[in-house]
Amino acid sequence: MAKHRSNRLAETLKQEISQLIREELKDPRIGFVTVTSVEVADDLGNAKVYVSVLGDSQQAKDSLDALKRAAGFVRSEIGKRVRLRHAPEIVFKYDTSIEHGAHIAQLLRGVKQEEEKDEGESHDQ
């Protein structure tokens, strides 16, 4: 039961935090940020918010720093928007899964090109 509740809360937090970042946070360092997932502890006291940032590594670092500074504001707004006895402590983390997936796709394309090149050379002989 607790796991089901934390999963529901995680989805709600994902939606609310996404909206907060889009509409309420006015820090110019925050670039194009996407909340990819939220993990809520079983006791509902902590929430890890995973974000991806469109841009280079410096833009990602700046955006993450700005989000970490705004975590208290985000928590207080969540407390107002979501019916909870205590709003969870918010921790922002950079999600590398998109970059990792792009890297794997690039490697697979390279392998496919090598195979096609090898097949072309074997047909020529």
Swiss-Prot record:
What protein name does the entry list?
Ribosome-binding factor A
Q: What is the lineage of its organism?
A: Bacteria, Bacillati, Bacillota, Clostridia, Eubacteriales
Give one Pfam family, short name only. Answer: RBFA
Gene name, per UniProt, is rbfA
Mainly resides where? cytoplasm
Function, in words: One of several proteins that assist in the late maturation steps of the functional core of the 30S ribosomal subunit. Associates with free 30S ribosomal subunits (but not with 30S subunits that are part of 70S ribosomes or polysomes). Required for efficient processing of 16S rRNA. May interact with the 5'-terminal helix region of 16S rRNA.
Q: HAMAP family from the entry?
A: RbfA
List localization entries.
Cytoplasm
What S-S linkages are listed for this chain? none
Which organism was this protein described from? Desulfitobacterium hafniense (strain Y51)
